Amino acid sequence: MKKKYYISISLLMTIIVLVFDQVSKWLITISMKVGDSYEIIPNFLNITSHRNNGAAWGILSGKMLFFYIITIIILIVLVIFYIKEAQFNLFMQVAISLLFAGALGNFIDRVLHGEVVDFIDTNIFGYDFPIFNIADSSLTIGVIFVIIALIKDAIINKKEV
């Protein structure tokens, strides 16, 4: 019988992402100055110490109150979505846990430091992508998983009609 909620898996996923996110950011802040960069994979991956007080690409830079309010709303909405829409669906619960962990990881940075620590610096197919962190990766993967889960549900529901 399928469980309604996989709370232990969801909590474990959230905690693992948060720990990796916060520890990696702490290591960057104690070992690198802002702007320092180390090439890991030539022309593809650098570790670059960067701070961001906005969103991706510096959008809404300095609008901390906005980010505090929006993040709290998003975290509440994610909990409600988890309870109401993710019942019996482990994949959706993992997706929401990734979203929650990513949002919370960057929220912690904003509250404690007034900015987010970014350090993953990639060059993908010649495009110098904005520098990001593990929380951002968790958010991106969570969004992709939610889309996959919604498409899968739509296909299953269409077959049942």
From Swiss-Prot:
Q: Which catalytic reaction applies to this protein?
A: Release of signal peptides from bacterial membrane prolipoproteins. Hydrolyzes -Xaa-Yaa-Zaa-|-(S,diacylglyceryl)Cys-, in which Xaa is hydrophobic (preferably Leu), and Yaa (Ala or Ser) and Zaa (Gly or Ala) have small, neutral side chains
| Lineage top rank: taxon | Bacteria
Location(s) in or outside the cell: Cell membrane
Keywords annotated in UniProt: Aspartyl protease, Cell membrane, Hydrolase, Membrane, Protease, Transmembrane, Transmembrane helix
Membrane topology designation: Multi-pass membrane protein
Principal localization reads membrane
| TM annotation in the entry | 9-29, 63-83, 88-108, 131-151
Note the Pfam families from the entry: Peptidase_A8
- Which pathway does the record list? Protein modification; lipoprotein biosynthesis (signal peptide cleavage)
Q: Which GO terms describe its molecular function?
A: aspartic-type endopeptidase activity
Task: Please give the biological process terms from Gene Ontology that the record holds.
Answer: proteolysis
Q: Does the keyword Hydrolase apply?
A: yes
EC assignment: 3.4.23.36
Write down any Gene Ontology CC term: plasma membrane
Q: InterPro entries, from UniProt?
A: Peptidase_A8
The positions flagged as active site in the entry are 118, 136
Question: Any idea what job this protein has?
Answer: This protein specifically catalyzes the removal of signal peptides from prolipoproteins.
Family designation: Belongs to the peptidase A8 family.
Official protein name in the record:
Lipoprotein signal peptidase
- Organism of this sequence: Staphylococcus epidermidis (strain ATCC 12228 / FDA PCI 1200)
